[in-house]
Regions:
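Conserved alpha/beta core of the MobA/IspD/sugar-nucleotide pyrophosphorylase nucleotidyltransferase superfamily
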Residues: 50-54, 203, 215-288
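Short, charged/polar "capping" segments at the starts of alpha-helices
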Residues: 8, 26-29, 105-112, 189-190
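Short beta-strand-to-loop acidic/aromatic patch adjacent to the donor-nucleotide binding site
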Residues: 149-160
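A short, conserved beta-strand element in the Rossmann-like catalytic core
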Residues: 5, 106, 159-162
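Conserved core of the sugar-phosphate nucleotidyltransferase
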Residues: 162-239
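Structural beta-sheet core signal
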Residues: 20, 54-56, 99-101, 154, ...
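Asp-based, Mg2+/Mn2+-dependent phosphohydrolase catalytic module
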Residues: 1-51
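Conserved N-terminal catalytic core of the sugar/cofactor nucleotidyltransferase
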Residues: 53-56, 64-66, 78, 82-151
Length: 288
């Protein structure tokens, strides 16, 4: 709570939420909550930390939406006037080279090259024809673009996060980690999970097995994309699967065994957009 001009200016420059009231008695919980909800849509500067790659696989079948009568593929479903993939990219809020893995049949039919380049100019597009043996295999289709010393961020194409990408990236660089996992608190076995030691370093990750209450969001950072490629290929060579698929999160176990430093970064909330029910819940509740 601040009413001096200097204090208000400092609060604004620090990107604090500022609520002006005429009288201290007017400072109610309802007004604070409403102001915070309004500020969810404020423009936060994009993270601009130099050369970086963001990889978004968007080649899933989206069968739940098809069964519910949706005619467009999931990444193109309208979410408050924007294709879902644009909502996801805007929410990541990171200046980078974007790389998308798309279904071959969708690329031409829906003019994905034009659309994705409008959302993220000069992006890279990789085709997949049909299904792979898991998300890790899908991401490696983009190996030619990510197998380098440039940082890599991988994200799901069907979720919305309440987070600050600047804060996350600053933390990753400040702590000089080799990898970072966005997380939230849950014990539901539909998620992936991370276990950490007393210093906050990840000691183990498990897919669909709640080894802790630190659930992973589905956004994964690697200080070097080449590390991800190396350890993903190593995991696949060892045939380490979950439910007969190669997942992305367990790749960190290979890095941890190689003495790489991995940390988690907790966010306020993750909103799923990946099913008709999740999308409906988001649209009805996010800005309430």
């Amino acid at each position: 709570v601040e009413d001096s001009p200097h204090g208000l200016l400092a609060a604004s420059r620090s990107r604090a939420n500022v609520l002006r009231v005429d009288n201290p008695k007017d400072l109610t919980l309802e007004k604070i909550t409403n102001k915070l909800n309004e500020n969810k849509s404020m423009n936060i500067p994009k993270w601009q930390g130099g050369k970086m790659n963001v990889l978004i696989p968007m080649a899933g079948a989206g069968s739940r939406f098809q069964q519910a009568g949706y005619t467009f593929p999931k990444p193109l479903i309208d979410v408050e006037g924007k294709p879902m993939i644009q909502v996801v990219v805007d929410n990541l809020n990171i200046e980078a080279t974007y790389i998308y893995v798309v279904q071959k049949e969708h690329r031409a039919k829906y003019n994905l090259d034009t659309l994705l380049n409008l959302i993220t100019p000069n992006c890279k597009i990789v085709e997949v024809d049909g299904l792979t043996e898991g998300a890790a295999c899908t991401t490696l289709l983009a190996k030619e673009f990510i197998d380098s010393d440039a940082p890599l961020l991988m994200a799901n194409s069907d979720q919305f996060l309440e987070w600050d990408s600047n804060e996350f990236m600053y933390k990753m660089i400040e702590q000089k980690v080799d990898g970072g996992i966005l997380s939230f608190h849950s014990t539901h076995p539909k998620w992936s999970f991370a276990k950490v030691d007393e210093f906050g370093y990840v000691t183990e990750v498990q897919e669909k097995n709640p080894i802790s209450d630190i659930a992973t969001v589905g956004v994964y950072y690697w200080a070097k994309g080449s590390d991800y490629v190396k350890y993903a290929e190593q995991m696949i060579d060892k045939n380490i699967r979950t439910n007969n698929e190669f997942y992305v999160c367990p790749v960190y176990n290979e890095a941890i065994a190689d003495c790489k430093k991995i940390k988690t970064f907790n966010i306020n909330k993750m909103w799923g957009l990946g099913t008709p029910e999740d999308l409906k819940y988001y649209l009805e509740n996010y800005k309430k």
